[in-house]
């Protein structure tokens, strides 16, 4: 196995032309700036207002279509509303290493023994899983302007497995991964991947807690102290590219680190409902933690979802979470790069 096959993640734009501002949005603009503590220079204010208005109108159109049953989720004006798609991609998402299909096939063969016939066990699995209710999941965090999305699901998956083993839920240090996994191939706040992060924890012999190595939203000098180690792993498992296998793993193992393809024009404004984006592809550019699954309405309605934990703060989505379409041909590549640690 090589890191090149895995998700590389930086962690999530077109500069608008000059246009007249919609004065009817003045009050809403001022309220939004206060809510999200936005401060601009006079020159920047106009540019940001134009972008914000374009996003507001796009969100309003989407939600009108939702009321007519044309889509399955609603969007909202949030912290990212003053950013173009390109600005958002540069800050949160970014670059992906190439995927080598030959090596993917090798992984699938090697991992077959981990999940013998798991795709036939679907009916025996629970209809709903939410590891938050079982104490496996720490609070939602916010990565900010650091492209560190790759680190959050790694700490999240380890936190869950350590809780399963010890009964203690300890928030682990994302900053430890950002500062110290460069020898494994990660690049701090520029980009990284989950494979390299798991490799670091495995070969380093431990990972510090958030309490002793807090998040700084920027890369620093590695200052890992083995005396402060709060978690160790014995290895990690890479799942075959299958939603059935992912379902089995989520139900029987716990929270699973994975990747998704983020369409910045819709994903970043998600509010509620089951996210289904026709423009999604197999191009993975963001990392999340799968903490459960289920369905909305009746099981036969086709509104099955994966419950994912994001790293964009509690003001995004369902207080930091999203329901993304499940059993829809690996929608947004949700099952393509799934991994979990052993402890």
From Swiss-Prot:
Glycans are attached at residues 228, 298. InterPro entries: Papain-like_cys_pep_sf, Pept_asp_AS, Pept_his_AS, Peptidase_C1A, Peptidase_C1A_C, Peptidase_C1A_papain-like, Prot_inhib_I29. The keyword Signal applies. GO terms for biological process: proteolysis involved in protein catabolic process. The keyword Methyltransferase does not apply. Pfam families: Inhibitor_I29, Peptidase_C1. SUPFAM superfamilies: Cysteine proteinases. Belongs to the peptidase C1 family. This is Cathepsin Q. It comes from Rattus norvegicus (Rat). The gene is Ctsq.
């Amino acid at each position: 196995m090589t890191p090149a096959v895995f998700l590389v993640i930086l962690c999530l734009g077109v500069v608008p032309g000059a246009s007249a501002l919609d004065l009817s949005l003045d009050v809403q603009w001022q309220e939004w700036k206060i809510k999200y503590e936005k401060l601009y220079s006079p020159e920047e204010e106009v540019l940001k207002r134009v972008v914000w208005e374009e996003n507001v109108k796009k969100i309003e159109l989407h939600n009108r279509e939702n009321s007519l049953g044309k889509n399955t989720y609603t969007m909202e004006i949030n912290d990212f509303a003053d950013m173009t798609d390109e600005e958002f991609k540069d800050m949160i998402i970014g670059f992906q290493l190439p995927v080598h299909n030959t090596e993917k096939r090798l992984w699938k063969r090697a991992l077959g023994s981990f999940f013998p016939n798991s795709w036939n066990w679907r009916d025996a699995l629970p209809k709903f899983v939410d590891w938050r209710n079982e104490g496996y999941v720490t609070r939602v965090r916010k990565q900010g302007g650091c492209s560190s999305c790759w680190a959050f699901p790694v700490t999240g998956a380890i936190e869950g497995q350590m809780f399963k083993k010890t009964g203690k839920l300890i928030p682990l240090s994302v900053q430890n991964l950002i500062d110290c996994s460069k020898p494994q191939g990660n690049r701090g706040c520029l980009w990284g991947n989950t494979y390299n992060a798991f490799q670091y924890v495995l070969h380093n012999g431990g990972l510090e807690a958030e309490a002793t190595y807090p998040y700084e939203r920027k890369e620093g000098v590695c200052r890992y102290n083995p005396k402060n180690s709060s978690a160790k792993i014995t290895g990690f498992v890479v799942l075959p590219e299958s939603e059935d296998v992912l379902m089995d793993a989520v139900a029987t193992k716990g929270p699973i680190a994975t990747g998704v393809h983020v369409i910045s024009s819709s994903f970043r404004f998600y509010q509620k409902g089951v996210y289904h984006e026709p423009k999604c592809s197999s191009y993975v550019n963001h990392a999340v933690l799968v903490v459960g699954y289920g369905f909305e309405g009746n099981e036969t309605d086709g509104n099955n979802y994966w419950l994912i934990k994001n790293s964009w703060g509690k003001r995004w989505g369902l207080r930091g979470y999203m329901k993304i379409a499940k059993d829809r041909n690996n929608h947004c590549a949700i099952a393509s790069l799934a991994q979990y640690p052993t402890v």
